[in-house]
Amino acid sequence: MTERKIALITGGSRGIGLGCALELAKAGCDIIINDICDAEKAQPAIDEIKACGVNAYFYSFDVSSYDAVKENVDKMIAEHGKIDILLNNAGITRDGLFLRMDMPQWESVIKVNLTSAFCVTNAVIKYMSKARQGAIINMSSIVGRHGNAGQANYSASKAGLIGFTQTLAKEFGSRNIRVNAVCPGFIQTAMTAELGNIDEYLKAIPMKRLGTVEDIAKVVKFLALDTEYVTGQAIEVAGGLMI
């Protein structure tokens, strides 16, 4: 019997993170989800993942804290033996026009969206290197490629993830570790529900609909499990927006 792969997903208790967890679970992966919430709030996500017939585990810690990440990743390895797949999905927005943006708005977004990817990847990739295999997916955004008014902090953090992805792909390709990014466009989540006039956004999307969490999850599953020769890519999943 083939040993199950184990996937770690940050920000995995809801939204895109949970959708990706479920997609990987349906493909037979055991799932470790991280979030900043407590175990009680994460339990519905754990139950939903377990219903796919796999094991699911929850670890609550701040992904932007280097020490907390190292402690918890070491604990995961001790308890589960390995991490085959890492999805750096944790992220926040603190939008505002640049002239009105203050330092806390800037720093909080960079810390959660970009610094966390460094912290978690730094802890996990050491084990992947020893195993000489692994798949890392960073959840970027279409605005990391093209920018967006009112999102200087968010756009910068997501652009940083693309550079981070390409650099690690070059550094770790010889160790059979693939590193890619996914760049969602407008996806039906609680975050985009706050945007207001969706019809205006739909005018710019050739496919004339918002994306779904499942649209993103299928690409993540492809990068994690279905390809062995794709690395260093930032794949836009945006219905043709920006072409």
Model-derived features with residue positions:
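Residue(s) in the substrate-gating loop at a strand-loop-helix junction
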Residues: 141
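Short, small/polar-rich loop/turn modules that mediate ligand/substrate recognition or access, typified
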Residues: 173, 178, 230-232
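Substrate-binding pocket helix/loop in short-chain dehydrogenase/reductase
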Residues: 97-98, 105-110, 201
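Alpha-helical segment proximal to the catalytic Tyr-Lys
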Residues: 126, 170-174
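Conserved glycine-rich cofactor-binding loop
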Residues: 13-15
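C-terminal substrate-recognition "lid" of short-chain dehydrogenase/reductases
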Residues: 118, 212-237, 242
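Active-site helix of classical SDR
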Residues: 121, 157, 165
